[in-house]
Amino acid sequence: MPKIGNIILPDFPLLLAPMEDVSDPPFRRLCKLHGADLMYSEFISSEGLIRDAMKSKQKLDIFDYERPVGIQIFGGDEEAMEMSSRIVDAVQPDLVDINFG
């Protein structure tokens, strides 16, 4: 069985990638109902999070029925990525994915 940290997945897991304007809570709910084993929120701008942008903050909404669920943050500034990772950690996702580049 594949394992990511303490998350144990089935042999052939069904994963939902972080997709902008697609993997929002209603879509994730549908995916979970249809067998998704691990899901990600939409990817979130690190700059948007540290500037308290409403659109970025809304993407932090995760719900217990979605677990395990991850959040991906993206950006190119080391300081912004560090600050935004602390914001993300506060909502307690099961995974944090870093897209730095």
Predicted regions and their residues:
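Extreme N-terminal starter segment of soluble prokaryotic enzymes
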Residues: 1-2, 10-14
